[in-house]
């Protein structure tokens, strides 16, 4: 009888240990599965710029928003409009959240204040991206900072389904509230895309 109870106790201990091991294996595999979604951006997104990833304008000509939204990189003197086209492709099978960032760069001339730089993002059909209004156009200063960095702003946050892609057009111009002066000023930003 004692021998039978000992066997049962051993079986219970063995079953308990097995259940604990299986439980921890399941937790660990679930943890690994969830943390695989934080693959570096270069392994999640493919970014292709139409030309370069830097936009620069000068204080040559302030422009009304209605005209600035139509800028396409052609038909005006250099430095009047800023325009950049890029495509973002999700190379994974999972949904990926991403950010389009604009980093203010030093210029050879005095710098135009962030409060006069209009930024407007559209898709390939020239429709405003989510968060951009047809009636109001934000200035660079008003975009949220990226990681407390006041020179780097989050211009747009989007989501791409697995293997999906999106074309983004970045339009930049000098606000018509700007007062022209004889001093040459400029504003330059680098456009980057990062997975979140």
Q: How should each PLM-predicted stretch be described?
A:
Residues 2-196:
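Long, small/polar-residue-biased beta-strand-and-loop interaction regions
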């Amino acid at each position: 009888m004692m021998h039978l109870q000992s066997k049962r106790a051993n079986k219970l201990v063995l079953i308990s240990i097995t259940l604990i091991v299986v439980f921890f294996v399941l937790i660990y595999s679930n943890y690994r599965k969830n943390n695989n979604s934080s693959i570096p951006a270069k392994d999640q997104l493919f970014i292709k710029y139409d030309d370069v990833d830097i936009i620069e304008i000068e204080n040559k000509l302030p422009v009304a928003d209605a005209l600035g939204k139509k800028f396409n990189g052609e038909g005006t003197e250099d430095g009047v409009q800023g325009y950049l086209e890029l495509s973002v492709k999700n190379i994974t099978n999972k949904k990926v959240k991403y950010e389009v960032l604009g980093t203010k760069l030093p210029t050879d001339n005095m710098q135009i204040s962030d409060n006069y730089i209009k930024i407007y993002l559209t898709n390939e059909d020239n429709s405003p991206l989510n968060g951009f209004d047809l009636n109001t156009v934000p200035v660079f200063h008003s975009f949220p900072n990226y990681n407390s960095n006041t020179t780097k702003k989050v211009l747009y946050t989007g989501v791409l389904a697995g293997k999906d892609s999106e074309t983004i057009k970045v339009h930049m111009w000098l606000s018509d509230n700007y007062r022209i002066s004889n001093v040459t000023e400029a504003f330059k930003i680098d456009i980057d895309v990062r997975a979140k």
